[in-house]
Amino acid sequence: MNPRRKKRLLITSLLAVALSLAVGLVLFALQQNIDLFYTPTEIIEGKKETGIKPEVGQRLRIGGMVVQGSVKRNPESLKVSFDLVDNGGGIVTVFFDGILPDLFREGQGIVAQGNLLNATEINASEVLAKHDEEYMPPEVSEALVGMDNFKANNK
């Protein structure tokens, strides 16, 4: 192999390694920012299409209805826990340390973002309540159709 070809091969190889490293770093950075949406039943039983369950420690979003009588507040701090349910019957407990939205109440549809502690518990870093009587994210709306307290959107 002549020196010119060796030089081209070396440069091409270095570029391929650098590109692979850059792609790997980008994917690693994005992995930490991707939040997957689950319902309580999907967390317990897995996604319908794939059967894939979230892993303990995984960052995710969960949507459902706050179970009546499940909200427990710590009188000495902002810590609160409550149960979420969907039409599949799965119940997941959410722990949150912070100020809940003004529209948060029992029987209300909410979305919580946080990390999965175990198969039925989530440590939420953020809790979102729907902002008016009509709007609800499509994923939550689909998951809650058939619930007693839920009125589906009329688009």
UniProtKB/Swiss-Prot annotation:
Residues annotated for heme binding in this entry: H131, Y135
A single GO cellular-component term on record: plasma membrane
Record carries keyword rRNA processing: no
Annotated compartments: Cell inner membrane
Gene3D superfamilies found in the cross-reference section: Nucleic acid-binding proteins
Membrane topology listed for this record: Single-pass type II membrane protein
Protein name, as recorded: Cytochrome c-type biogenesis protein CcmE
Gene name tied to this protein: ccmE
